[in-house]
């Protein structure tokens, strides 16, 4: 999966699931869109669907530090490369 595909998938998820229409890739989701821990859990579930396998507890823990779309995409790229 290319970076562009990851970005497009994440933007689609944010639009469909969280009604975030046209975010900047460096927007802080928590500050700008009031993204909370419940939203983060829902996003992790969608990321698992996107990559086609469950995340480990360690991977989920690492995800809790993510704040921007670029960081989400970096995170997914890292996980895909590891597998």
Language model features with spans:
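Phosphopantetheine-dependent thiolation modules in NRPS/PKS and related acyl-activating systems
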Residues: 2-45, 49-83
């Amino acid at each position: 999966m290319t970076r562009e595909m990851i970005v497009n998938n994440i933007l689609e998820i944010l639009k469909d699931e969280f009604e975030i229409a046209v975010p900047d890739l460096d927007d802080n989701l928590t500050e700008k869109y009031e993204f909370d821990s419940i939203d983060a859990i829902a996003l992790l579930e969608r990321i698992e669907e996107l990559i086609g396998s469950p995340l480990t507890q360690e991977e989920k823990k690492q995800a809790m530090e993510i704040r921007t779309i670029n960081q989400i995409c970096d995170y997914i790229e890292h996980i895909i490369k590891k597998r």
